């Protein structure tokens, strides 16, 4: 509760939750996916920032009886319109038929996995968490062999797909300088609950007073961009900077 904005009781076993971790000023430290493996066992599939040291610091300060560690887990994303059929051929009907934001603990050929119906794209997709780092080659070769006839190829996250889907990227689109209300993520904040968390008072104040800036989507006219921007672009109106573009 000290770290996560959404009530832990809202998270049911075998389900995922998109959550926010904020600092004392309400700034976003990370926006991980929370997976509840058991009543007292949770995973945070984090974005690109150091949450491990933050979580350990919170635990020490609060004197909580909790163990925080980085497990032997290697994530692999399987995204795209044919991902369900590939997953079905690779691991069977049960993981392939998972509902959105559900996950299952699964063993394939003696290899322990966690498979979730999540992903960082606007497409149908899954995330496969390998729980044995020594089996990475076997898992990779199996999925690629099954997926090859369906056009599966290795790649990286498509910036345009996640931008079009309004999926924010930590560091690029948000940092601790941004709060959930500015980012349009107020649906993830529960400020009127009885439980406490880091940043609660600051977020209550921000909610009451309102924000002075907002994160919005823009459409840019002209020729298509050759690639993504490497730095933030200033938005000028009447020779005055009124904002900036984070991702394009």
Segments and roles (model prediction):
Residues 13-21, 100-102:
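A short, Trp-centered hydrophobic/proline-enriched beta-strand micro-motif
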Residues 1-12:
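Single conserved hydrophobic/aromatic residue that forms the stacking wall/gate
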Residues 3, 21, 234-237:
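Hydrophobic beta-strand positions
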Residues 34-248:
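Conserved, structured C-terminal
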Residues 2-4, 26, 212, 227:
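Residue-level preference for beta-strand/loop junctions
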């Amino acid at each position: 509760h000290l770290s996560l904005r959404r009530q832990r009781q809202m998270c049911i076993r075998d389900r995922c939750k998109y959550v926010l971790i904020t600092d004392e000023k309400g700034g976003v430290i990370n926006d991980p996916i929370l997976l509840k493996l058991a009543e007292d066992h949770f995973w945070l599939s984090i974005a690109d920032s150091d949450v491990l040291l933050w979580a350990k610091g919170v635990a020490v300060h609060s004197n909580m009886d909790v163990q925080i560690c980085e497990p032997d887990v290697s994530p692999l994303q399987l995204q795209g319109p044919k991902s369900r059929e590939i997953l079905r051929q690779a691991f069977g009907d049960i993981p392939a038929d998972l509902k959105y934001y559900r996950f299952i603990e699964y063993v394939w050929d003696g290899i322990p996995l966690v498979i979730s119906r999540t992903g960082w794209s606007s497409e149908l997709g899954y995330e496969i968490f390998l729980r044995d780092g020594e089996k990475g080659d076997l898992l990779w070769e199996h999925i690629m062999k099954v997926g090859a006839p369906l056009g599966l190829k290795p790649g990286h996250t498509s910036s345009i797909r996640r931008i079009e889907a309004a999926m924010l990227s930590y560091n690029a689109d948000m940092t601790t300088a941004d709060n959930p209300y500015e980012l349009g993520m107020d649906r993830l904040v529960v400020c009127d609950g009885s439980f406490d968390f880091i940043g609660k008072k600051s977020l209550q104040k921000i909610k009451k007073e309102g924000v002075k800036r907002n994160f919005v989507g823009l459409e840019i006219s002209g020729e298509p961009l050759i690639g993504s921007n490497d730095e933030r672009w200033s938005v000028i109106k009447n020779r005055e900077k009124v904002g900036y573009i984070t991702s394009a």
